[in-house]
Amino acid sequence: MNPKRCAACKYLRRRCPKDCVFSPYFPPNDPQKFACVHRIYGAGNVSKMLQQLPDQTRAEAVESLCFEAKCRVDDPVYGCVGIIHLLKTQIQKTQNELAKTQAEIAVAQTKLSQTQNSDFM
């Protein structure tokens, strides 16, 4: 048993076994991290997911679950899809602005070359 229980075991009010699947990813000093994930996915589902993954990918999976759970808590309707949509909209606006600026540059370059050509004649 770990001398300090991980955030998951504290939240679930149980002893933290030596081989606790949660302890490497939910430290005792960050209880909100597990609470958010538990609220959205449930401890049992998260435990099953982590046990099915290779050890080297578990940390990334936990970070992804935490991010998605926080997004779902913040925006229950859209979750992280709302952020994705917002970012896609910003990208589209920026691409449109870039295209407009490039067109303005092309027009200015054309006018400049016409002016230079007429000066030589």
Curated annotation (Swiss-Prot):
Pfam families: LOB. It comes from the Eukaryota. InterPro entries: LOB (IPR004883). Residues 4-105 form the LOB domain. PROSITE patterns: LOB. Belongs to the LOB domain-containing protein family. This is LOB domain-containing protein 24. It comes from Arabidopsis thaliana (Mouse-ear cress). The gene is LBD24.
